[in-house]
């Protein structure tokens, strides 16, 4: 996410909402609701978080990063938004979560500093907000140790995802602010798989994240038509 791989409008969206990041009744409610699901999925697929060195790319206000630290990981969260990072730092301090740090730095720049330093790299709900997702994937591959795990999540690009993730989530159910997502930045699983292979990662698992607006319940299932998560591995011995 060097300056060439940052969309200032995307940064501004989340800067404006930063103060609400830890309010579970705000626009960030969906992130709080899905966090236990994605946290458990990452923990399980990575063979545990405790004692691992973890990087969270595009960490925002720290919801996932802090929850991984609470499970015993040594976490660095990075983002290009200053206001969300300030919120994340303050929340970790208030909650006395010591094994976590935050930095405002592009992931590509960090990859030049800390190649092969992390057991686990996560990049969740961010890929659809950057101009060049392939560059992010490559940087994550550089940062993880051989034998380490890299996790991504994003939104598929098809008529169903437009209906559900934009019309439904932003306009009908109002789960998210209008304009949160740009359909043209959504990423098909085939495109994601191609970029993963090109970066030198091995695709291990892909699962869909689903929502029932009547029960307000989220769950994981194989269908990846809308939201989905990806587990990859950097082959080799650490």
Curated annotation (Swiss-Prot):
Function field: O-methyltransferase that catalyzes the 2 O-methylation steps in the ubiquinone biosynthetic pathway.
Record field: catalytic activity: a 3-demethylubiquinol + S-adenosyl-L-methionine = a ubiquinol + S-adenosyl-L-homocysteine + H(+); a 3-(all-trans-polyprenyl)benzene-1,2-diol + S-adenosyl-L-methionine = a 2-methoxy-6-(all-trans-polyprenyl)phenol + S-adenosyl-L-homocysteine + H(+)
Keyword Transferase tagged: yes
EC number: 2.1.1.222, 2.1.1.64
NCBIfam families: UbiG (TIGR01983)
Family membership noted in the UniProt record: Belongs to the methyltransferase superfamily. UbiG/COQ3 family.
Entry's Gene Ontology molecular function annotations: 2-polyprenyl-6-hydroxyphenol methylase activity; 3-demethylubiquinol 3-O-methyltransferase activity; polyprenyldihydroxybenzoate methyltransferase activity
CDD domains linked to this entry: AdoMet_MTases
Positions annotated to bind S-adenosyl-L-methionine: 38, 58, 79, 124
Entry-linked HAMAP family: UbiG
Alphabetical GO biological process terms: methylation
Functional pathway: Cofactor biosynthesis; ubiquinone biosynthesis
Name of the protein in its database record: Ubiquinone biosynthesis O-methyltransferase
Keywords: Methyltransferase, S-adenosyl-L-methionine, Transferase, Ubiquinone biosynthesis
């Amino acid at each position: 996410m060097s300056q060439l791989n940052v969309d200032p409008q995307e940064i501004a969206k989340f800067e404006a909402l930063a103060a609400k990041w830890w309010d579970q009744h705000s626009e960030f409610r969906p992130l709080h609701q899905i966090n236990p699901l994605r946290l458990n999925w990452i923990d399980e697929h990575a063979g545990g978080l405790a004692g691992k060195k973890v990087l969270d790319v595009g960490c925002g206000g720290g919801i996932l990063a802090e929850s991984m630290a609470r499970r015993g990981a040594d976490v660095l969260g990075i983002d290009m938004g200053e206001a969300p990072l300030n919120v994340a730092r303050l929340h970790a301090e208030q909650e006395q979560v010591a094994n976590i740090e935050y930095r405002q730095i592009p992931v590509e720049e960090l990859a030049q500093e800390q190649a092969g330093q992390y057991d686990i790299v996560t990049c969740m709900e961010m890929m659809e907000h950057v101009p060049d997702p392939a560059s992010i994937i490559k940087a994550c591959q550089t940062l993880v140790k051989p034998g380490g795990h890299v996790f991504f999540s994003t939104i598929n690009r098809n008529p169903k995802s437009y209906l559900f993730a934009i019309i439904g989530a932003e306009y009908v159910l109002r789960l998210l602010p209008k304009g949160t997502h740009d359909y043209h930045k959504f990423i098909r699983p085939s495109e994601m798989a191609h970029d993963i292979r090109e970066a030198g990662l091995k695709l291990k698992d892909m699962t869909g994240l689903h929502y029932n607006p009547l029960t307000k319940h989220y769950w994981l299932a194989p269908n990846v038509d809308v939201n989905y998560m990806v587990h990859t591995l950097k082959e080799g011995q650490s």
